[in-house]
Swiss-Prot record:
Pathway annotation: Amino-acid biosynthesis; L-arginine biosynthesis; L-arginine from L-ornithine and carbamoyl phosphate: step 1/3
Gene field: argF
Record-linked InterPro entries: Asp/Orn_carbamoyltranf_P-bd, Asp/Orn_carbamoylTrfase, Asp/Orn_carbamoylTrfase_sf, Asp_carbamoyltransf_Asp/Orn-bd, Orn/put_carbamltrans, OTCase_ArgI
Binding site for L-ornithine: N165, D225, S229, M230
NCBIfam families to which the protein is assigned, alphabetical: orni_carb_tr (TIGR00658), PRK00779.1 (NF001986)
Keywords: Amino-acid biosynthesis, Arginine biosynthesis, Cytoplasm, Transferase
PROSITE patterns, per database record: CARBAMOYLTRANSFERASE (PS00097)
Signal peptide start-end: none
GO biological process, one term: citrulline biosynthetic process
Role, per record: Reversibly catalyzes the transfer of the carbamoyl group from carbamoyl phosphate (CP) to the N(epsilon) atom of ornithine (ORN) to produce L-citrulline.
GO cellular component, one term: cytoplasm
SUPFAM superfamilies in UniProt: Aspartate/ornithine carbamoyltransferase
EC code(s) of this entry: 2.1.3.3
Organism: Ruegeria sp. (strain TM1040) (Silicibacter sp.)
Name of the protein in its database record: Ornithine carbamoyltransferase
Organism taxonomic ancestry: Bacteria, Pseudomonadati, Pseudomonadota, Alphaproteobacteria, Rhodobacterales
Amino acid sequence: MNHFLDIHKTAPEDLRQIIDQAGQMKTARLGRPKGTPDDEQPLAGHMVALIFEKPSTRTRVSFDVGVRQMGGETMVLSGKDMQLGHGETIADTARVLSRYVDMIMIRTFDETVLTEMAEYADVPVINGLTDRTHPCQIMADILTYEEHRGPIKGKKVVWTGDGNNVCASFLHAAGQFGFDLTFTGPAQLDPEDEFIGFARNAGSKITIERDAAKAVEGADLVVADTWVSMHDSQSSKERRHNMLRPYQVNDALMAHAKPDALFMHCLPAHREEEVTSAVMDGPQSVIFDEAENRLHAQKAVMRWCLGV
């Protein structure tokens, strides 16, 4: 039994196994209707709990479809259903759920909820997102880059904007997969030293560059994410927009990257804010392949967790 809590907590050889299997499983499904089962049914007889303290379209649909394609069943629970940490402890909830299901995926605001769930659960726990990291997204991103351009090892990735949870997992991946990462954004939004330190200690070149055009020079991959959250106040949104406007990904910025550089965004995107429609819909964008690959990467993660 394996938990998938964070990229830096998973061995590089296991991460590589997951990526390779995801690619194989994707190829095996080419041309099939989405609702048809996989030839292999490794999750037959398995029940998977999908817990959403923080709602999501892509995470819910991709995990639900993935489980069903592999022969399993899902139970979707919202924060209202669970009341995690209010009344019954997270530890007791983990123990009880372990009697009903074979695996737990949780998308939560608080990383401590994830770690405590994993500590006390008797079944694998998968990090569907926390406010600190988003490892499943990055596995999809690695899969996407490699199916378009080959091995990501030694490549230059540029993260633009806010050093958020997705950026943190990209830094973990830099260390585990052996690529370099440049962060370009305002100093107030730098990624935490912990994430930068992990990647540097693993041998990756991590650079902080305030000038977006300089940062993107020679990039193999440029990545953006939303500047604001639905929970931000109007004044906070305006402040962040003013701070981040110099880091918008547009055609002029992409011109500084390599001619064959790719653009990624985990979606949903705010068009004409962090990225222009011209880039999103342009030939360098692989955002919809990236969205699809959440499905294939997570299927491989689930198989690895269960050892099937």
